[in-house]
Amino acid sequence: MRWLSSIRIRCLLLGVLAALLLLPACGRGRHRVLEVAYVSAPQAALRDQVAAIFNRVGNVKNGERVEVLDREKRFARVRTSTGIEGWIEQRFLVDQKTFDALQKLTADNQNDPVQAPGVLRNDTNLHVTPGRDTEHLYQLASGAKVAILKRETAEKQSGAAPTPKSGTKTGAKPSAGPVLEDWWLVRDTLGRVGWVLSRMVDIDVPLDIAQYAEGQRFVAFFALNEVEDNDKGVQKKVPQYLCVLTDPHDGLPFDFDQVRVFTWNTRKHRYETAYREHGLDGVLPVTITKEDFDKEGNLPVFILRVKDDAGTVNERKYKLNTPIVRRVLAPGEVPTRSGKKRRG
């Protein structure tokens, strides 16, 4: 009967071994990855349990990739790249689709020309599309520097109807159409691209030309070239600027409606308006380059994109031969008048 006992022992050992092999598989089943998500909050704590009283087991930061293992009401159990597991509020997470959309937005606009540098007034989210309720992932801190690429408009988030003021007619007609807000497509210092509310960004215009805004809003500006200036024995190079402006209102049907060129007077050591043009139905981006003009030499050139009455976008080329700005017409091109235009 000893052989029978030996068989029983072997069977028992095989059963124990099989159970041990199944345990990790069961563990993997309980902690299988449901999906991948990304942290949209500036920072969030991971807790050991979904309860009023909990222990913090770790922290995650904005943009961090996590694996979602489980979901329970408002919370998701996640695992970080370092293997830490814990519960986090689901509102602090966005899905892979949002991450991929921002990656595509970055790739599609990685070579777009910068229209102006900007500085953020407050902490601001990078949105996938213009709009306060659209998906977002990365958050930029107040004071962060960004490069402005494009402009779009989006309907302002609707709220409660305002209470009529005393003395106003209750039967007055509501304003026509939705209220629109301006949004900038920006690139941050890490190369990430997204949409931000324009009022959250200050265009970082040099003070020397910002003082000539005359109540208008700077949309973009560019240094066309530099000139040598000698002021009381102090030699320096001074940039000459193309500035693109518009009325200080959101929701306009154009990106800009006026341009000005500021050149430096080397005798009076100050900026002067060399050229200005109004009445444009302008569309970003504006392009800056250089071109050879035979006897005039190699001159700075800027190209504006302007809509005509039919809504077709046409390019207009201009050259600066300090202090004169002139339109450069293509063979057979007939200039069109946009509105008031003068030098001064």
Predicted regions and their residues:
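Short beta-strand elements that form the blades of beta-propeller/WD-repeat-like
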Residues: 238-252, 297-308
